[in-house]
A protein has these predicted regions:
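Short mixed-charge
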Residues: 29-41, 147
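Short hydrophobic beta-strand that contains or immediately precedes a catalytic carboxylate
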Residues: 11-14
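Short beta-strand scaffold segments in enzyme catalytic cores
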Residues: 47, 99-103, 210
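C-terminal catalytic or substrate-handling cores of phosphate/nucleotide-
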Residues: 72-141, 151-171
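Short active-site loop/helix that positions an aromatic residue
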Residues: 17-32
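A conserved active-site cap/scaffold subdomain adjacent to cofactor or substrate pockets
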Residues: 36-90
Length: 217
């Protein structure tokens, strides 16, 4: 809960996993201090509020280290079951929802999700979920993107060239994403659901280390 904001309607846009960790720490401290009043430092964590019209969501792109044992030809044939694929002469920055760019073997491809894998569910309908549920997990074997070391994430602010650079060094495959919208974010929150990991790259971002506060001496 937050104080002094009256009837301002608030939604958490980022840092869900860090907030959950802070809650776990707070609950643990409460167990250790059964006489807590609610005013102790461990009952709070730092947050910042922005008006939604001043926030910009950029895509959170993906890079993958291998093709899970598939050859390039086998991999493309496999994903053609769920996506329409078109080779592109230029880098692909998706212009529409359910559209993805794919960089593989120094070539860009445009992927479009087939209608039968689209969903009206506020979470499963997100582009990050479409890619995860229909390609990253079933084809590449990436079941948990939070912990799988074969996948990494690149903020959209770093551009498409960064994806190409990664594929020339430690990765072989990259996906450029269409950014999640504020409306989609609100729909997930209003449904009482959680956003998938690495769904959004928010700007502006606060500098790290602006505030440091000890919970206990």
């Amino acid at each position: 809960a937050s104080r002094g904001l009256g009837d301002v309607y608030k939604r958490q846009a980022d840092g869900h996993h860090r907030a959950a960790s802070a809650v776990k720490v707070g609950l643990k401290r409460r167990e250790e201090h059964p006489d807590y009043t609610g005013e102790e430092e461990f009952n709070y964590f730092l947050s910042v509020l922005f008006p939604d019209e001043e926030l910009m969501i950029m895509p959170y792109n993906r890079v993958v280290k291998d093709l899970n044992g598939y050859s390039k030809e086998e991999f493309i044939k496999k994903i053609e079951e769920k996506f329409e694929i078109e080779e592109s002469a230029a880098a692909v920055e998706p212009a529409y929802k359910a559209e993805f760019g794919m960089y593989l073997d120094e070539k860009w491809y445009k992927l479009k999700a087939k209608k039968d894998i689209l969903s009206d569910d506020p979470v499963d309908g997100l582009d990050v979920a479409i890619l995860q549920n229909n390609l990253l997990e079933p084809v590449l074997g990436i079941h948990d993107p939070k912990t799988d070391k074969r996948i990494d994430f690149v903020g959209g602010i770093r551009g498409l060239l960064e994806l190409e650079k990664r594929c020339h060094t430690d990765c072989v495959l990259a996906f450029s994403m269409y950014p999640t919208s504020i409306a989609e974010l609100f729909a997930v929150a209003d449904a009482g659901r959680l956003m998938p990991p690495k769904s959004t790259w928010f700007e502006p971002k606060l500098r790290s280390g602006l505030f440091i506060h000890k919970i206990e001496e």
